[in-house]
Structures are given as structure tokens and as C-alpha cells.
A protein has these predicted regions:
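Conserved phosphate/ATP/ADP-binding segment of small-molecule kinases
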Residues: 2-92
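Conserved post-catalytic alpha-helical subdomain immediately downstream of the catalytic base
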Residues: 71, 98-162
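C-terminal catalytic "cap/lid" subdomain
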Residues: 77, 162-163
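Glycine/charged-rich beta-loop-alpha catalytic/anionic-binding loops adjacent to active sites
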Residues: 89-101
């Protein structure tokens, strides 16, 4: 908790993903944070954090946004795409799943977080950021075991293809 307090106090822009895995299930909870500019979770992580299996993802994401006083909360939903809540825009932005071929989904949430944090931190709109981050995740699911990074030129080409 001491490290979290230091990060909260010193970070110019703070993006947080409290990833759930076999080594930390339930112990690295978003509720340990009192602020974040961006919280990025997948749907199971969201449901675990709120202890709620039944309410809508949007309702639970807003609950987390308020708990952590976050500017943005993004929820990746696998085959259901992604959503992002924006406090300042008072909107929910949605992106459909942008990949047609999934080889390995490990790392897709990390790719989403990386591009979402970078985009929002640079001042892009949450709508545009959700799309770009979803495109990065779509590329990532086509890479086995994060073998290769997502090259900027590959992301540009993929986005161009999606927009045609």
C-alpha cells in the first residue's frame, strides 16, 4: 500500500490495471487505489472487484469509477469488444471486437492498456482512444505469446484497413 500511495502522489498520469491471475487472485484489487486517471480491467476483473455477477458492465464500471475517482474506466470484454466511461465527457464509448482471427489472447489487455493510457495521457478523446486501443488489442491476439511487439507501422496499417 505504501507504493500505491507514492504512485498516487507523484504520478502525472496514472493508468492502473489490477490484473487477476493465479498468483494474486483477489489480492491486487482496484479498491486499494484512491485515484487513477485511467482504470483498465477486463470483465471478470470488474466483476471480482465489485463482487457482482449480475449488474450491467456499465453500472459496475461507473461504480469503480466513483470508488477510485477515475477520469476514465475501460472494460475489455473479449468477443463483446470494449467500453470506456469518461467522467469529463459524461459518455460511454464502445468499440466492437476488431479481430477476426484469435491465436493467443494473452497480452491483449496489456496492449489495450498501453495504447489507452498513452492516448488519454496525450489528450486524445476517449472515443478515439477506445478505437485505437481496441485496434492494438486486435493485432495482439494474432501474436503468439507476445513474441513480437506491436510496431507502430503495423498499427497504422491495421487502422487504415479498418477505416476503408
Amino acid at each position: 500500500d505504501k507504493m500505491i500511495k507514492v504512485l498516487e502522489a507523484k504520478s502525472k498520469y496514472m493508468a492502473v490495471n489490477t490484473q487477476v491471475n493465479s498468483g494474486n487472485r483477489g489480492y491486487h484489487a482496484i479498491s486499494r487505489y484512491s485515484r487513477a486517471d485511467l482504470v483498465s480491467l477486463n470483465e471478470p476483473e470488474l466483476r471480482l472487484a465489485t463482487h457482482n455477477r449480475y449488474d450491467s458492465v456499465e453500472t459496475l464500471a461507473e461504480k469503480i469509477r466513483q470508488t477510485v475517482n477515475a477520469k476514465h474506466v475501460s472494460i475489455t470484454r473479449g468477443t463483446n469488444g470494449a467500453i470506456m466511461l469518461s467522467r469529463d465527457e459524461n459518455e460511454i464509448h464502445r468499440a466492437p471486437v476488431l479481430s477476426t482471427k484469435v491465436i493467443d489472447r494473452i497480452g491483449a489487455g496489456d496492449a489495450f492498456l498501453s495504447l489507452a493510457g498513452t492516448g488519454l495521457g496525450a489528450g486524445l478523446s476517449s472515443e478515439l482512444t477506445t478505437f485505437i486501443a481496441s485496434a492494438a488489442a486486435a493485432i495482439d491476439v494474432q501474436i503468439v505469446c507476445n513474441r513480437d511487439p506491436i510496431a507502430p507501422v503495423d498499427l497504422y496499417k491495421y487502422i487504415t484497413t479498418l477505416l476503408k
